[in-house]
Amino acid sequence: MAAESSFDIVSKIDRQEVDNAVNQASRELSQRFDFKGTGSTISWAGEHAVEIKSNSEERAKAALDVFKSKLVKRGVSLKILDVPETPKVSGKEYRLPITLKEGISPENAKKIAKMIREEFPKGVKAQIQGDELRVSSKKKDDLQAVIAMLKNSDLDVALQFVNFR
């Protein structure tokens, strides 16, 4: 009888890639002509937050677009960003605090486990382990089908698949 195969579903942030994107976006904001004199900056605001500052709402949103483009070029999913609808205003400065989401929330973990149970009723088991899920099955083909299904699903979480056994 074949041993069970498994993998883990996690949602982790590659901090080095995000840091590279912040540095590239900061460099572009300082060099681009349309950002001259706007005081637009992008910087880390704690361990899991990035802050964009500018003197107008339009420039703050344009700086956010620059940051998003740098993240995409670095291969980081935009689903990790928690961006407010409008920038916070303090005096003449517009601040856009961006939180980076890491880990799978219990609600999303239950939702993913339910999707797996509905799609693959026999042979595939999903176990919630803190902020990650372990999916196991006797057939590796089923596990590959689960990965394909989750990649095509419209979840608001960036998923990575690790620890294939």
Swiss-Prot record:
It holds the Pfam family DUF520. The keyword Nucleotide-binding applies. GO terms for cellular component: cytosol. Keywords: Nucleotide-binding. SUPFAM superfamilies: YajQ-like. One of its GO terms (molecular function) is nucleotide binding. Belongs to the YajQ family. NCBIfam families: PRK05412.1. Nucleotide-binding protein. This is Nucleotide-binding protein Tfu_2672. It comes from Thermobifida fusca (strain YX).
